[in-house]
């Protein structure tokens, strides 16, 4: 690396092909570019469309900033995948029988990128590579050319620390049943969880072996970039840096860097609703009167569960915006009670598909967030200062729920008991009503709201000269020198 203090840091970003990974990576690349670095995002032909328009707008507004896209080939059919399968959205937008097979096949097929990555690193010699956790082979590729590889997990310190402590101590093996609560050993805060809420850890399965590769790659890497801010999870940031992996930089919340209407509206897919009309609808509501319900880009609930949510929302009497993911192959909408939309007209809005989430969360009419506890959604809710109803489904989402309900105390659990990949643990309408009312009404609700608003202030301060701003400075200085 050059010691020239005036040269630009060149960072290559390589996100996993899922919206929950690509959206924060785009935010991160824009952030680095705005701080004087040159950013290069690696992706596939179909996924490049997600990045192109936001990057063009960003460059038009900031002509001196350097950010571009490099497209890698991903021959789906040759790799044993269906034509056009370049994003997890391809096989998670339905509940078909081969979903599990396709998931594993997709993860393993990404190794095809290794040769292309090595050629790029050899010819461009960037200062560092920030590659997704699901690309464990990226560490070895970067080592060949003495390029530091940083890992981006797309989650926070709390879940990383929780998973580490459970992996090291295996406390789930000494309880009487999968539903018996236990305290996660060594983790600050006496956090209680059950075996049913932990993602399947069968290390002999093909996916289990793949995840072992991921963990080994983490340890060999040059460190971790975390989309979080110190004030959100200080005990866990300290624990991670002292016990789990010594080198980590927190630079979030990344969503906060999107300040303009277009920036917020263009994150991810094209919204399934006109953003201006959506905001007009919210403008017609009183401040703090609308609850927003969304389960992210992967969770895919069955009709029976959607029916219960609809019935619960109607009974709660709350104004709402409810985002329902479109399922491929399901033409008839059998998930709505008869006459539901007519009865809630004016009080409720259903968005079928993709929503301009940050725009909705940031609106003054929005007063709460029913969320699957995916890390991006959780952080966006935190940045908007909203109390939450937590409804985790899979992956590390139950850990994230514990952060909200047990540590931050800004949320109420809907009562999900099982980590069930993508379809969700069945929750009755009565539980939906109870959780929504609990997060909106009463003295405890007011206290949760106050705590949530303080966290939003801390999030803003962190990126505007605070902890995240300073950690990014430290990172840039270290990898430029």
Swiss-Prot record:
Inducing stimuli: Induced by pathogen infection, by H(2)O(2) and by salicylic acid.
Q: What is its EC number?
A: 2.4.1.-, 2.4.1.91
What tissues has this protein been observed in? Answer: Expressed in roots and flowers.
Q: Which residues form the active site?
A: 21, 132
Respond yes or no to whether keyword Glycosyltransferase is given for this record: yes
Query: Molecular function terms in GO for this entry?
Result: flavonol 3-O-glucosyltransferase activity; quercetin 3-O-glucosyltransferase activity; UDP-glucosyltransferase activity
Q: Which domain of life is it from?
A: Eukaryota
Q: Give the Gene3D superfamilies listed for this entry.
A: Glycogen Phosphorylase B
Q: Which key words tag this protein in UniProt?
A: Glycosyltransferase, Plant defense, Transferase
**Biological function:** Possesses quercetin 3-O-glucosyltransferase activity in vitro. Also active in vitro on benzoates and benzoate derivatives. Involved in stress or defense responses.
Record protein name field:
UDP-glycosyltransferase 73B3
User: Which species?
Assistant: Arabidopsis thaliana
